[in-house]
């Protein structure tokens, strides 16, 4: 791959005083006499060894090894080497960085990166000069932006969109689905188009064989279940996710979304209350116990590998197994919901399902000794060629529009959902950490309620669900503001 000079990648317009107030204070030796920052001056630090933190899937599937090998070859003339940071993917940069144990470059979700930015542990970046700048979704860039003293800074470089997707087995569809499960005659199974049909199919499949299920999901998981609330008017924080005094999990008709969760749970078992399904979904989808589940695009390769193994265990050759798995494992955007909020209402208008989502990307630690070499690595890793390879090996949904147009299909649909605000991005502030426990507790409780006896049920009406969501909102507010 051709190396492009990074001499143009500089921060010549940002006074060091502003930067010092925003991110980790820069040593005085890194500020020039005119008061301009020279952190990113394009002068590659020869001999640099860049510690890069990647996610576990990229490492286990071999993508990361190929990436750093290619980078090291491309930058061998500078004696610059990228290595695996060899730390947990959830490393605590705030505590590790100052002591030299943290990575130079980290790949994380936008909410994690921006919490580091808020606490001054990563650098704002001169992103306009990166190869990916003009081709990357504006919504994705926004996920890494923060305003300080009237100036907008970007503290991360987007790589891929994370959002819930429906995974299903095409070979587990009923043989007569085109006659009995395609009401609008569009050659798409009804159970893939609407949650109402998926619930009906799930009930029928389990009735025919009590050991098998249709759609299965860990409903307690806020990341996957919050979208049902958002679809009916809920939100996380007001003012574009910046006003933590305005918490919106009970807003609009959010209780309809909570009711949807309960209706879906009625065709599952009690494993839907906790994370059991999250951990078993790969093997259960592969062995046919589940017809469908919900997960994120970046684990497509894991589902695929499990299905390949299942076919091989049935006696298929490796080549046959791979071909069958690629054909029968399908990842699509989520089905539509009834506007009425009742999955048994066949007459209702349909609405799109909104989802919680995030943007994963790269950032640079404020504690690195090699900012320019680190920026060179990010520029290399987010190039067209390497994002295509990341897609091919991991099944991600890229944030580069040129790659998305090349791939097409469901990837393009997800990209459009991001641009059209059907993906509700996780807030880029520290307050987001307070939403998980109250919402997970609520989702687990309303799911468990489905399996309680009638006399023990806590949520018998939509009003009960509304009151439960209002309590969740208060709990989040208390957690955010009590110690202020």
Predicted regions and their residues:
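Short, solvent-exposed loop/beta-turn-alpha elements that line the ligand-binding surface or hinge
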Residues: 42, 126-136, 175, 180-191, ...
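Short, well-ordered beta-strand elements
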Residues: 45-58, 78-83, 105, 155
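Extracytoplasmic/periplasmic solute-binding protein
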Residues: 149-160, 164, 193-253
